[in-house]
Amino acid sequence: MRILFSLLTLSLAMTAANAEAADCRLKPKEVVTRFMTQFYVDKKVREAFETWVDPGYVQHNPMAATGRDAAINFLEPFFATHPDIHYSIARIIADGNLVAVHSHGKFSADDRGIAVVDILRVEGCKVMEHWDVVQPVPEKTANSNGMF
């Protein structure tokens, strides 16, 4: 009986979670726009991750641990020790449930910064998976087009 009750409870919890994801009326691009604005621009790391990122979040950056809690535990102190860091989002591009965010990060006002492309996979209203590439903005360039 105890096993049956446990299975029923688990089944109801999974049904509720699936219904929540199915009820999400936001498109993946809207989910990522809200997440990245709250995270990168507003610097509300915990709030952004707890609202928009699945607990089983898969991280593909080899320098970062996987999982939502691991991301929060790394990023909160990072932003706290770098209060002048600033990100501006240049563009957000979506293809189905994959969303790419091209942004410019600067550690200070006089820093040339870094160009970042984050790729996020979204299911329902949750970011499930993340890849990124980061490139320093060079002092001199071979063209005048800029990186952003």
Q: Residue spans of the language-model regions?
A:
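A solvent-exposed, acidic/Ser-Thr-rich amphipathic alpha-helical stretch
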Residues: V45-A94
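Hydrophobic/aromatic beta-strand elements that line small-molecule binding cavities or substrate pockets
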Residues: L75, Y87-I92, G105, A115-R121
